[in-house]
């Protein structure tokens, strides 16, 4: 089972998607693909930042996010107490406290493989990961 990193979910929104990512997702069972609430937050942050620059794009992105949340509704994993504790442990060991570390903690707690292009962000966490862009 898999946890999509923000970079992979964002790739799926693009008009000219990476064919390897599309192929990978087509081969995965929808019930085996999850999102982290952290990814939703990262995209929301991008929407808010875009509003001042390009309101139309921000609105389109928000509509896409709303649809994505509906599709993944029962497969969006929260940052609950076990995830927060795992994140705290990873953060103390690695010396990082970013969003990718929360995503790694979520995957570790749920026994998921992170699907990402940013493999270097996950290498030190001990989480399993794959790069569908290759």
Segments (PLM) and residue ranges:
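Short, well-structured N-terminal submotif of metal-dependent ribonuclease cores
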Residues: 1-35, 39, 49-67, 134
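A generic structural signal for short hydrophobic patches within well-formed alpha-helices
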Residues: 9, 40-43, 84, 122
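Active-site neighborhoods of divalent-metal-dependent phosphate/nucleic-acid chemistry enzymes
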Residues: 45-50, 59, 70-117
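Residues at the C-termini of beta-strands that transition into short coil/loop
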Residues: 37-38, 80, 118, 133
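Short secondary-structure capping/turn micro-motifs that flank functional sites
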Residues: 103, 122-124
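Nucleic acid-binding interface residues in structured DNA/RNA-binding domains
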Residues: 3, 113-116, 123
């Amino acid at each position: 089972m898999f946890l999509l990193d923000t970079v992979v979910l964002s790739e799926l929104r693009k008009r000219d998607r990476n064919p390897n990512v599309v192929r990978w997702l087509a081969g995965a069972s929808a019930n085996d693909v999850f999102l982290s609430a952290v990814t939703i937050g990262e995209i929301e942050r991008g929407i808010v930042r875009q509003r001042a620059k390009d309101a139309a794009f921000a609105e389109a992105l928000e509509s896409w996010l709303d649809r994505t949340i509906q599709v993944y509704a029962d497969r969006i994993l929260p940052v609950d107490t076990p995830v927060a504790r795992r994140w705290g442990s990873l953060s103390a060991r690695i010396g990082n406290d970013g969003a990718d570390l929360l995503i790694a903690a979520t995957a570790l707690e749920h026994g998921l493989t992170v699907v990402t292009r940013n493999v270097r962000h996950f290498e030190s966490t001990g989480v399993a990961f794959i790069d569908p862009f290759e």
